[in-house]
A protein has these predicted regions:
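Gly/Pro-enriched, hydrophobic low-complexity segments
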Residues: 144-234
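N-terminal leader/targeting segments and the immediate start of mature chains
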Residues: 23-72, 76, 80, 119, ...
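A short, polar/proline- and glycine-enriched secondary-structure boundary/capping micro-motif
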Residues: 96-104, 119-122, 186-188, 210-215
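Acidic/charged, solvent-exposed loop-and-adjacent secondary-structure segments enriched in E/D, K/R, S/T
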Residues: 107-140
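Sec-dependent bacterial lipoprotein signal peptides
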Residues: 1-23
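N-terminal beta-strand/beta-hairpin edge segment
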Residues: 61-67, 71-106
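Residue-level recognition of conserved beta-strand positions in structured domain cores
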Residues: 89-91, 111, 178, 203
């Protein structure tokens, strides 16, 4: 049976403000300890609300920074619901070009082979930067809560924990956090427009430390040729 776990809105909004502030400082838990167990059906509804219903083409500027250097340029991402993504990025004058096609949390191909890992350490974090949450794995323990406008939910597996907070409205946000064996892998915060399309996104990876910023230039419906999912041949 579907569960709707409502909490006092003021409490949840205050909690969310503190949590998102933690994205910029010492990160705390994204989902409150008091969140209750929820059904896969309920989580499925929350996730489905983030998945585009049509093919989308995103164009964006990107900037990657760590303690040693920084690099940036422009890129595009083609998303075919429910879970297929092709991205292409390059620096000035085509330098450092990289491409990859992904289905869910598995790469079909990547050029160069480490194209995804060099920028994003985890596929749920990658998807979150485009405003899309991922479904839980079989056997995950699920918790969540909502006040109708703010939704927070978490999947806990044997070693990994994935958590999301989503807010609606004109300037909505999707925040995602991934932990491995309790250690923070990364946290992504994406600002959304009223239609749910991404406006800007930031990924913070504390272990490097590093951050990746995306500034979206456009989001549009698109028709994709079948060969975009096939790796280019030499």
């Amino acid at each position: 049976m579907r569960q709707r776990l409502f909490v006092d809105r003021g409490v949840l909004v205050a909690y969310l403000a503190l949590t998102l502030a933690a994205c910029r400082a010492a990160p705390g838990a994204l989902v409150p300890v008091g969140a209750a167990p929820v059904s896969r059906e309920q989580v499925g509804e929350w996730v489905a609300a983030t998945v585009p219903t049509e093919h989308r083409l995103h164009r964006f500027k990107w900037l990657f920074q760590d303690e040693r250097s920084s690099a940036g340029g422009r890129g595009s991402a083609r998303i075919a619901p429910p879970d297929s993504l092709r991205f292409d990025v390059a620096g000035p004058f085509g330098s450092g070009a990289a491409s990859a096609a992904v289905i869910g949390d598995q790469p079909l191909w990547a050029e160069p082979p480490d194209a995804v890992k060099k920028l994003v350490p985890n596929y749920p974090l990658m998807w979150a930067m485009f405003g899309v949450a991922r479904f839980p794995e079989p056997g995950d323990s699920l918790r969540g809560l909502t006040d109708g406008r703010v939704i927070a939910w978490q999947y806990a597996g044997a070693t990994d924990t994935v958590a999301y907070v989503r807010t609606g409205g004109k300037d909505g946000k999707l925040t995602a956090e991934v932990r491995h064996a309790g250690k923070l892998v990364g946290r992504a915060e994406t600002t959304l427009d009223a239609s749910g399309a991404p406006v800007k996104a930031r990924l913070v990876v504390p272990s490097v430390p590093a951050k990746l910023d995306l500034t979206f230039l456009s989001t549009a419906r698109a028709t994709f040729a079948p060969d975009i999912w096939t790796a280019r041949r030499p």
